[in-house]
Each structure stands twice: as structure tokens, then as C-alpha cells.
Amino acid sequence: MLWPALRSVLFQLDPERVHHLAHWALHRVPLAVARARRPAPIPALAVRCMGLDFDGPVGLAAGFDKGDVALPGLFGLGFSHVEIGTITPRPQPGNDRPRLFRLPEHRALLNRMGFNNEGMEACARRLAALPPAARLGPVGINVGKNKVTPNEDAAADYLACIERLHPYADYLVVNISSPNTPGLRQLQERDALDRLLRACVRHLAERAPGKPLLVKLAPDLSPEALDEAVDVAIAAGAAGIVATNTTLSRAGVERHPRAAEAGGLSGAPLERLATDVVRRCYARAAGRVPIVGVGGVMDAEGAYAKIRAGATLVQAYTGLIYGGPGFVGRVNAGLARLLERDEFSTLSDAIGADHRQGGGKAAG
């Protein structure tokens, strides 16, 4: 009950300042404290995906830790995995401030950060300095291109990040779907996506055979373009689909004073759209690769909807901002109750249940 009161105080401050304060605090969590405070895993929620073991489905989405590497503190919150990034080859400041806005009436955020990060070298140094024990679960690294890099040269940026960062990643994600880097989403078009992913998959396979490389897609693709992107990604050798990034749509928040701000919308207004994209990706992939569901995971019900729609794992960021330190524990406890209600023995049994007749009792 303390979190709502603390949140009301923090929400009086600039959102980016609060973000930095949170990182400052998380960096100072000793590993022993993180282990002691980490919620106990629930065996029914464990899942194996892409050759990796996850003690639950709920991970931290890219965008929160952009290379500061506060792993013990983040794992101490209960996340089963942490995705760092987006990381670019060279440091870049991102877009001008203000660039992060809260829409508390809608439990949403709107951002136009623009891949602000200190670059792959700084990230690699920090990851190299971490003791192995600090990795309380799989660590993903989400990579992108620098803003000044033209799309025709984008592959070089992604390959540079893969080259430098793959030793420290359990999996990598190619981010081509942020709305805050001009022209980036054009890399989702068929030919560009095919060339980029084939180059990335080949480069990683030569250096770390078997290490998974995923691609993160936008929620704003047409159904036909989404189907095509999934087909291209699988044919190119991607190990999974991350669905989705933030949306350019303002559906549900049209009348909010911030609705006219440029940037991507995340949080509760994205939940239904992102779940629909997960559902379509799962159907199109037809079991060939797993789907990681992201977008509007604000509670156990939202996470469960994505799992039943086909997500093997889910990720949250905005849900953490609104839900506070106890967010993951509450989601996991709620998921366990929902599995029991629908007579599933394990989370794996519920993945894609909405696509199967007789796949447990009707959700909701």
C-alpha cells in the first residue's frame, strides 16, 4: 500500500528525472539483497524457450535499462529476464527534451527518447565487469542503428553491435520498429528486412552458434505487412518475434492534452492492439518460432491474455512504472491463479490456448 502514495509524489517530478533516480537506486542494490528480496519462483510458471530456462514468463522490456546494467536490482524485482537496450554502436544523446510524458489517467507513457545510450563500448565494459552471479536469469540485448546512419548502411551498425555485445547476451534482439528514429521502420519492409536479418543471423551464427537472435516488430503494420514480416523473419533464421514496440496510434487517448506529442504510446491503451498482433504472429508462425508479447502488460490478466494468444514470454516496462516494485510478484501470483482456474498444470499448457478448441476453460 506504500507504493500508491510514493508514486503520487514521484509523479510530481519530471519523468526522466524519476527514471534516473530509479536507476541510481537499483544500481545500489547488493546482490545478496537482490537474491533475498526476489520473489520465490512459482514452479508452474517456469518455461523453456530458445534453449534458455526462464523461471517465469515476465521479463523487463527494452527501454528501461539502456546500458546502465543494473542487473541485480532489476532481477531482485522478480523479472525472469532482463532485456538491455536499445544499444547503438556509437553514443548518442537521443531526441531533445522533454521527450517522456505520463498519461496517468490512461496508465500510459508517451516517449520520443530516440535510442539515447552511451554506445556499445560502454555497455560491453559494464557487462564484462559484472560477476556471473549477478545474472539471476537470461539477459537479452536489444540493438539498433545510430540516428545518423542511413538505412542503406544500417546493417553495419547492427553487425557491429552483435560483434561487440554477443559474448554478454543470452539472446539478441534486432530493433527495427521504434517510431522515434526517422526512417527506422522502413527496415521492416520485405527486401530490407530480409537482407538485414540474413546478415545478422549469419554474423551471429559464425561467432556464437545457437545463440538466439530475435526481431522486434511494430504494432502499426497492416495485417498483410505483419504476415510478410513474420514469414521473412523466420525464413531468414530469426529465433523469435518480439511483438510489439510502442504505437503511433492515439486510440483511447485522443482527448488527452499530450496526445498531439510526437512519439510512441505504451501502457494500457496499447494492450488490446499488442495482444491482437501477438495472436496474428503466433498463427502465422505456426509453432516455428516463439512469440514474446510486449505492450500494455499492466497486470496478470493482461499477461495471461497475451499468453493465451500465443506468447511464450511477456515483457513489461510501463506496467512497472505504474505498478511499482511489487508489480512482477503480483503478476506472477495472478498468473498462477488464472492457470489453476482454467485447469492448466503449467504455463506452457496455456500458450496459444485461444487458438485451440477445448484449450482450457474460457478465459475471463
From Swiss-Prot:
GO cellular component terms listed in the entry, alphabetical order: cytoplasm; plasma membrane
Any matching Pfam family: DHO_dh
Pathway as given in its UniProt record: Pyrimidine metabolism; UMP biosynthesis via de novo pathway; orotate from (S)-dihydroorotate (quinone route): step 1/1
Catalyzed reactions per annotation: (S)-dihydroorotate + a quinone = orotate + a quinol
E.C. number(s) listed in UniProt: 1.3.5.2
Entry keywords, A to Z: Cell membrane, Flavoprotein, FMN, Membrane, Oxidoreductase, Pyrimidine biosynthesis
Main localization, broad class: membrane
Entry note: cofactor: Binds 1 FMN per subunit.
Subunit structure, interactors included: Monomer.
Protein purpose: Catalyzes the conversion of dihydroorotate to orotate with quinone as electron acceptor.
Alphabetical list of HAMAP family matching this protein: DHO_dh_type2
Name of this protein: Dihydroorotate dehydrogenase (quinone)
Organism listed in the record: Anaeromyxobacter sp. (strain K)
Higher taxonomy: Bacteria, Pseudomonadati, Myxococcota, Myxococcia, Myxococcales
Gene: pyrD
